[in-house]
C-alpha cells in the first residue's frame, strides 16, 4: 500500500475525521455489550430516520437495502422484508462500532469469545504448499473476527482502498495488526507472488466491480456481475479455495468463524460455472443469518445487456 503523506493525513480537511477517530477510540474502550447495545439503538434510529426526506444519505442506503431484500427474498411478506431490512441496519451499525475494538483497542483479547469451526480444512488446504484462496462475503462481523482468525492461521488480506486518507490509514493500520500482508485489490501481481509463496489470501468475492472484470452468474436467482478473478488466481498456482463465513451471537456476545472443505474440481475451466458456484456458497452462508449480511451495497448495479436497472 502507498504510504500516506503527512500533508494529506493532517490537512485541515482531515481534522473532522480525526475527531471521529478519537470518538471511535473511546468507543473501543467501552464494554463489548455496551457497544452492541449502542449499535442496536443507532441502527434502529438510522433505519427510522432513513425514511425522512432530509436524511438523503441514509435514504439511499435504505432504498438499496430494501431493494436487495425484496429481490432476494420474494417469499417473505412485505412486513417480514421490512423487519429483515431493519435488522440488517442494526447489525451493520454494530459491526461498524465493533471494529473499534481490534483496530483501536488491540489490548482487548477477543479470542476467547471467537470460535473457529473447520480450521482443519484450512490447514489441510495450506499443507499442499500452493497457497490458499480464503473466499468469503461482506458479513457485518468480517473485521471483528480478525483477531481470532489471525490467531488460528497466518493470513494475508485483500482490501479496497478508501479515498479518504485518514480512513485509509486507519483500516490499513488496523488490519496490519493481525494479518501478514494487507494488499490493495488492484495489486494483482502481489496476489500471484503471495500464492506462489504458499500464502493464504482472504478476500470477499461478492461486490459488483463492473462488467469488465466479471461474468454474469445467478445470485439469489438474479444475474449478478461476479468477479472471475477467483478462477484465475486458483488456476495460476493450483491454489485450493476454502470458503469462510462469520457471524455474531448477540445473546452470548460471541462471534464464530466457519471454514469449509476446499472446493472440489475448482476451477472447472468455465468462468460462469465457477462464478455460479462461488455465488451459491455465499448465498447459502447468507441464508443462515441474512440480517448479518451487508445489504447496503449495490450487488446488482451492473446489469446484463438489455436488462432494466434495479436501483
Show the residue positions of the predicted features:
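Membrane-anchoring hydrophobic helices of lipid-metabolizing enzymes
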Residues: 2-136, 170-173, 179
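Active-site metal-coordination segments of metallo-dependent hydrolases
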Residues: 57-64, 161-165, 223-227
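Generic structural signal for isolated residues within well-ordered alpha-helices
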Residues: 25, 68, 148, 173-174, ...
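General small-molecule cofactor/ligand-binding pocket signal
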Residues: 115, 181-183, 260
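Short Gly/charged-rich anion-binding patches and loops
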Residues: 22, 64, 120, 144, ...
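Non-catalytic C-terminal accessory region of glycerolipid acyltransferases
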Residues: 2-11, 33, 71, 82-86, ...
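Catalytic core of membrane glycerolipid acyltransferases/transacylases, capturing the structured
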Residues: 128-186, 208-218, 252
Amino acid at each position: 500500500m502507498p504510504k500516506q503523506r503527512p500533508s494529506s493525513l493532517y490537512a485541515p480537511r482531515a481534522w473532522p475525521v480525526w475527531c471521529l477517530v478519537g470518538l471511535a477510540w473511546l468507543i473501543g474502550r467501552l464494554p463489548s455489550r455496551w457497544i452492541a447495545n449502542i449499535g442496536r439503538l443507532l441502527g434502529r434510529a438510522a433505519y427510522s430516520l432513513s425514511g425522512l426526506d432530509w436524511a438523503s444519505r441514509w435514504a439511499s442506503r435504505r432504498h438499496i437495502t430494501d431493494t436487495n431484500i425484496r429481490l432476494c427474498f420474494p417469499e417473505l411478506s412485505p412486513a417480514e422484508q421490512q423487519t429483515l431490512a431493519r435488522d440488517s441496519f442494526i447489525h451493520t451499525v454494530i459491526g461498524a462500532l465493533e471494529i473499534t475494538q481490534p483496530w483501536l483497542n488491540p489490548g482487548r483479547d477477543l479470542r476467547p469469545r471467537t470460535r473457529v469451526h473447520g480450521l482443519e480444512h484450512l490447514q489441510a488446504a495450506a499443507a499442499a504448499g500452493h497457497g490458499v484462496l480464503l473466499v468469503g462475503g461482506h458479513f457485518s462481523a468480517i473485521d471483528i473476527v480478525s483477531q481470532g482468525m489471525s490467531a488460528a492461521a497466518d493470513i494475508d488480506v485483500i482490501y479496497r482502498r478508501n479515498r479518504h486518507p485518514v480512513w485509509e490509514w486507519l483500516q490499513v493500520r488496523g488490519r496490519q495488526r493481525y494479518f501478514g500482508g494487507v494488499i490493495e485489490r488492484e495489486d494483482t501481481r502481489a496476489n500471484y507472488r503471495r500464492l506462489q509463496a504458499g500464502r493464504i489470501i482472504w478476500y470477499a468475492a461478492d461486490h459488483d466491480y463492473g462488467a469488465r472484470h466479471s461474468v454474469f452468474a445467478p445470485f439469489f436467482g438474479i444475474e449478478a456481475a461476479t468477479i472471475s478473478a477467483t478462477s484465475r488466481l486458483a488456476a495460476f498456482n493450483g491454489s485450493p479455495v476454502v470458503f469462510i463465513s462469520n457471524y455474531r451471537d448477540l445473546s452470548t456476545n460471541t462471534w464464530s468463524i466457519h471454514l469449509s472443505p476446499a472446493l472440489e474440481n475448482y476451477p472447472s475451466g468455465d468462468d460462469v460455472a465457477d462464478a455460479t458456484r462461488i455465488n451459491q456458497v455465499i448465498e447459502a452462508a447468507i441464508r443462515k443469518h441474512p440480517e448479518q449480511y451487508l445489504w447496503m451495497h449495490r450487488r446488482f448495479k451492473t446489469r446484463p445487456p438489455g436488462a432494466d436497472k434495479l436501483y
